[in-house]
Amino acid sequence: MRKQWLGICIAAGMLAACTSDDGQQQTVSVPQPAVCNGPIVEISGADPRFEPLNATANQDYQRDGKSYKIVQDPSRFIQAGLAAIYDAEPGSNLTASGEAFDPTQLTAAHPTLPIPSYARITNLANGRMIVVRINDRGPYGNDRVISLSRAAADRLNTSNNTKVRIDPIIVAQDGSLSGPGMACTTVAKQTYALPAPPDLSGGAGTSSVSGPQGDILPVSNSTLKSEDPTGAPVTSSGFLGAPTTLAPGVLEGSEPTPAPQPVVTAPSTTPATSPAMVTPQAASQSASGNFMVQVGAVSDQARAQQYQQQLGQKFGVPGRVTQNGAVWRIQLGPFANKAEASTLQQRLQTEAQLQSFITTAQ
């Protein structure tokens, strides 16, 4: 009888040990909330907005004998690894979300993140960060963890051997943003709509200028290339997706300093204006200037020209529209020096809440 009780106790102890071990294996520690120990960085890219999950693209699946389980809680997901780059041509295939693949959009493919969803992608080699929209599945093979569209790869300056970090951004129904991708980060709202100008006529009516609607694209890194063969530094402004901010009026890259322009004085025939409203002297006064202020890029030439004309009339400066691949760049100027271009930048920011940067006339 004593032996039977001893056997029962041993069996009970083994069962308790198995239960304890199994319980420990199934327990997953809740990750600590993201804590920001550094400065807040403003990044750009895809504009995160609440979207219902795709009904067909978020099921667990198998491929090439391997099982993939869709991430149910992106707030607990962080990943780092090599990034691939989309090489398909526009319209050649559909993404897992059912959308036509477009390499000019800031999108990405991931094996298990929800579709659609958003993530902050960081190039660990140079610190550049942008927001991408996950709308496709992959990659499969080559030990890559994510596949970036050509536009996203260009903005990050990545190659097929670049290591990146993936931090999901969670968008609530009210539009608020959270998740690992929001640690030390604020997402720049990219809009090109101009508010009504201030009423300086003592009650006279003023007309508002509206920006182009539709497929407005973020400024591509390719628009920042200067004539300097060494290229632009990786520490570009926050508006362009890098972790540091340049001082106002600083050009990304080194350009030759233009020859000093002679100062010509002439009798004033117009009413005096306040210092804050001084219009920079542009093309007609400084035909030899080579500094331009770029305010954005859109995919439609007619809309770009209309927007450039509206801005030119509002701010009293000439401008131009130039093609860069699939987009049309909207630029104001030229100006004789960076100081004049910077003056317009300040007006664009204060009067129209428009982000811009200084580049050189090609």
Swiss-Prot record:
Keyword Membrane: yes
Example GO molecular function: lytic endotransglycosylase activity
Membrane topology of this protein: Lipid-anchor
EC numbers on record: 4.2.2.-
Span list, region Disordered: 198-276
SPOR domain segment(s): 285-361
Keywords: Cell membrane, Cell wall biogenesis/degradation, Lipoprotein, Lyase, Membrane, Palmitate, Signal
GO biological process: cell wall organization; peptidoglycan metabolic process
Subcellular location(s) of the protein: Cell membrane
Signal peptide range: 1-17
InterPro entries, alphabetized: RlpA, RlpA-like_DPBB, RlpA-like_sf, RplA, SPOR-like_dom, SPOR-like_sf
S-diacylglycerol cysteine lipid attachment residues: 18
Lipid-acceptor residues (N-palmitoyl cysteine): 18
Gene Ontology CC annotation, any one: plasma membrane
UniProt feature, compositional bias: Low complexity: 262-276
PANTHER family: ENDOLYTIC PEPTIDOGLYCAN TRANSGLYCOSYLASE RLPA
Function: Lytic transglycosylase with a strong preference for naked glycan strands that lack stem peptides.
HAMAP family documented for this protein: RlpA (MF_02071)
Similarity-based family: Belongs to the RlpA family.
Protein name: Endolytic peptidoglycan transglycosylase RlpA
